[in-house]
Amino acid sequence: MNKFRKIFKGDPFIWGIVFLLSAIGVLAVYSSTGNLAYSKQEGNTEFYLLRHLGFIVVGLFVMYVVHNIPFKFYSRSSIYLLWLSIVLLFVTLFVGYNINNAQRVIPIFGFTLQPSDMAKVFLVIFLAKYLSKKQQEVDNLQVFIRLLGMILLVIAPIIPENLSTALVVMTTSTLLMVIGRIKTKFILGLLGTGVLLAAMFYFLLMNLDMNKYQHTRMPTWKKRIETYMGTGENTDSNYQQVQSQIAVATGGFWGKGPGNSTQRNYLPHPYSDFIFAIIVEEYGLLGGLLLISAFILLILRALKVVLESQRSFPALVVLGIAVSTSFQAFVHMGVSVGKLPVTGLTLPLVSMGGTSIIFNSIAFGVMLGVSRHIQEEKLKASTTGVGSIQKDEEEDNK
């Protein structure tokens, strides 16, 4: 164990969660990509397994590198990395690849990049930096407006093609502002405005002639909402959720066993959007509870890191990333069991998808880097005193 901790620094429980999610993902992706392999790779069922394994290995390497990077790098580079993400998001709107009727990825060096995955990570780091720097000005309306402006700049290009991701980003950002002690009346005003806009959007969506908007995602959004509310026709969204619920219901307590899923043959994208349903079908309620517990544990370990931190920036970073990752996971699970409308959100570190794996690995690497830094900081405090910690706080806010 001591040798492990010397190599893999930071919170050992977070490392355990990483390895658990990665292992479950490899098994689930291999089981759920059979049809895809026969339709795209002439029956080579190992193709997607090996590709997914390759991304996992690269992701773990990236995670290891990131968790060893000096912590001040995150603070100083956050604004530049966020602006790069924003530029790529707007580029995607014009030259992005069309996947499932949405332009979400762009080609870079022979690979496809989903900038929204990148933006989710770097926005959290930027918000943590800005909130920690402005702790004495959190009651200032200008501080709130600047934060909100940057958040809207990120989600504006995401909304047309990936509304569910935009909602995850907005929810996480709002929670971070609450934790960062932004004035309550500003938060309530934001929530009130959000509810009003959502009501207006729903009214327009239900009453507009969708034939005029076939080139947009609006017909898809309308169908998914109608399916969820039980007022729509028998659509693809309805079919997806029915098949997903069948998978969950037939899994029982112990599951059908690895590789024995039947609903993978009927579910669209069982290796990404509905991978939780396949996991529950094959590994039962026990497997589902294991995954749920892993993400709950992630939040609890993040809270532990926060309580141990004597500085606001690292505390906000680790909690923001943990909440964002877990919230996305719980939304994915809610869709799979029919409690939420179809969103297209993947299960972090489990679903197939190279960009998602890499940027989730970066996110976990940052969390591990924070916990490693706090461990070292506690040791420094015991030998050099609190003054050095106060000096580091000033360095974070530069």
Where does each model-flagged region fall?
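Membrane-helix boundary/helix-loop-helix interface segments in multi-pass membrane proteins
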Residues: M1-L21, L27-Y30, N35-P160, M333-L347, ...
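Hydrophobic alpha-helical segments of polytopic membrane proteins
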Residues: I79-Y80, I86, Q142-P157, L163-N211
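Alpha-helical transmembrane segments of multi-pass membrane proteins, especially transporters
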Residues: D117, Q142-L147, L190, L316-S324
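Transmembrane alpha-helix boundary/anchor motif
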Residues: F61, I69, F126, A199, ...
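Loop-to-helix entry and N-terminal half of a specific, functionally important transmembrane alpha helix
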Residues: K304-G344, V350
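Hydrophobic, glycine- and aromatic-enriched re-entrant/interface helices and adjoining loop segments
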Residues: I99, V105, L191-G287, S312-F313
